[in-house]
Amino acid sequence: MILNNRGFTIYDMGNPYEDLYIYYLENSPDRKEEHLLGPDFLGNWIEDGSSFLFFSKPSREFVQRLIDKNHKLKFNDEFYFTYEEWQGGRIEPIEVSRFYIIPPWEENPEINGKIKIFLDPGVVFGNSLHPTTRDSLKALSEIFKKKRFSNVIDIGTGTGILAIGAGLLGAEKVLAVDINPLAVKTTLNNVRLNGLEGIVEVKEGMAENFIGNQNDLLIANIYYDIILQLIKMGVFAKEKSFILSGLMQSQARDIKLELSKYPIEVIYEWNNNGIWHTILGRVMET
């Protein structure tokens, strides 16, 4: 590890991810059992009660050792990807609006007038390559031009990139929430990489348990069904401003229709090639 010019650590051994070996299990091991998975274990992505165990090297024998110990686990399949295949392209420095996003294994360049985000996405969604992530960063840049926010919540934080962006733009407190423990682990690492431990708090849990507290800004780059459910619950309208993303064209139309039932103003929309939509809006005072 080395110190960069902002005083926190970045990687000095190059990209730690080259090959990904993924083992798909029915059910999920206890976190206390993860020490059985050996030195090349990267993390466990839990989806619908199943586990996807990620390793940097072939590790079938470690997985079998875990299954032999925990009989509720069942081996389903295994996969191999290069890291670039998994992430949808090479992870390299990229400029998005006011931000310059740098993988911590890349050289830390001098960039004038840009806010640096050091981001290790691991195997989690949110690497700045996807249009919804980029447009959400643009929306953050736009809304922070108008005011500074005291408290921000980012639900479905993924890698934490949007929560970190809000913190670096000047938010006093940011809460980053995700239901997936691997996303929480990844976000915690990225918060440390950017020196934001005193600003960005990371929690594991359901989105509906954290919103409705009159946050200055809510960020949700998540599944359409969850956004729609949160709006219909009514607690969404207690937030003051919002960024909604992860929406396809017909979904964005349905979301705006649902928002129209509340005193809400859509400030701006980003439309990426007619496919992905991002909405920036605010709740009007009544």
Model feature map: region roles:
Residues 129-206:
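Conserved SAM/SAH cofactor-binding pocket of Class I
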Residues 78, 102-104, 120, 203-205, ...:
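Conserved beta-strand termini and adjacent loop/short-helix elements that scaffold enzyme active sites
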Residues 85-146:
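SAM-dependent Rossmann-like transferase core, predominantly class I methyltransferases
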Residues 2-109:
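N-terminal auxiliary segments of SAM/dcSAM-dependent transferases
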Residues 179-285:
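S-adenosylmethionine
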Residues 63-64, 111, 164, 229-230, ...:
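Short glycine-/acidic-enriched loop or helix-start segments at secondary-structure transitions
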Residues 51-52, 69, 169, 233, ...:
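Alpha-helical structural signal in soluble globular domains
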